[in-house]
């Protein structure tokens, strides 16, 4: 077997034939620009559309299949298939911008204790007022994260579809937990990763993502749900909300 890639990109995908190509091509552009040794994995998560065929048609992409539908099941499948020293978890409706990969590699090279790195979303397909609201929400979330981490000494923060982990550190932290199936899964990872090394959330690692959940659930309700699940995952180690809707 060849040496481990420097980074594995894992993209869970359930019925994502429309948005998936833009996600994968953005990743491919970053890999090509940097010359980084990387692999790109799409986890076809029980899709009923052409997700698998679309992914297989893109050069350099490997498709693995997870028949049990659910975000955490898909992330775990990708984690088990990935060979990279680092694993970048990118959602199928998300696009990494130019120089995103530089910031990732530089951050891990600069801090030998860094085990997880993440940044916020910039929602590219919603009106300006919703984008501004989301940035204000992230700002409040960041203050809560900083207080919990540096004052109370509990938990940390990552954005589920835009985070990178040191593979061996995630294995040491126990991998992905079945306690969380959607809401709170990223906070749970951040909390456990924080026990084995440094977890950093930075505005310098912003990624572009679809605001389809903001449109579907409403901005206020989305904010309430994510806030409640962040607190429940941090302090009670379980989700506040078990059900979710797939917006496509």
Question: What label would you give each PLM region?
Answer:
Residues 16-31:
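Short, well-formed alpha-helical segments that are part of the catalytic scaffolds
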Residues 18-21, 48-57:
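Acidic helix N-cap motif at the loop->helix transition within catalytic regions
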Residues 26, 44-52, 94:
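A conserved acidic beta->alpha catalytic loop
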Residues 66-82:
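Glycine-rich, basic loop-to-helix element that forms the pyrophosphate-binding segment
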Residues 87:
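Short aromatic/hydrophobic "clamp" motif used to bind/position activated sugar donors
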Residues 99-131:
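Conserved donor NDP-sugar-binding/catalytic core segment of glycosyltransferases
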Residues 119-126, 134-156:
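Short, flexible, basic/aromatic active-site loop/helix in glycosyltransferases
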Residues 182-189:
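Acidic donor-binding loop at a coil-to-helix junction in glycosyltransferase catalytic cores
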């Amino acid at each position: 077997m060849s040496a481990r890639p420097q980074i594995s990109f894992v993209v869970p995908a359930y019925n994502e034939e429309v948005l998936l190509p833009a996600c994968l091509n953005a990743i491919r552009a970053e890999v090509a620009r940097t010359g980084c040794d990387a692999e790109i994995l799409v986890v076809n998560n029980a899709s009923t559309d052409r997700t698998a065929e679309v992914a297989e048609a893109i050069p350099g992409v490997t498709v693995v299949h997870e028949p049990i539908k659910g975000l955490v099941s898909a992330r775990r499948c990708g984690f088990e298939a990935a060979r990279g020293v680092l694993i970048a978890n990118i959602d199928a409706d998300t696009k990494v911008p130019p120089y995103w990969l530089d910031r990732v590699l530089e951050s891990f090279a600069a801090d030998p204790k860094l085990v997880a790195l993440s940044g916020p979303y910039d929602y590219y397909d919603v009106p300006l007022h919703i984008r501004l609201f989301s940035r204000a929400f992230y700002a409040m979330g960041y203050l809560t994260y900083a207080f919990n981490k540096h004052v109370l000494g509990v938990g940390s923060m990552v954005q589920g579809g835009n985070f990178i982990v040191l593979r061996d550190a995630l294995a040491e932290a126990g991998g992905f937990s079945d306690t969380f199936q959607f809401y709170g899964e990223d906070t749970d990872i951040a909390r456990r990763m924080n026990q084995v090394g440094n977890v950093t959330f930075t505005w310098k690692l912003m990624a572009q993502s679809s605001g389809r959940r903001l449109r579907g659930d409403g901005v206020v309700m989305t904010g309430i749900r994510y806030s409640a699940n962040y607190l429940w995952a941090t302090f009670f180690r379980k989700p506040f909300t078990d059900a979710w809707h797939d917006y496509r």
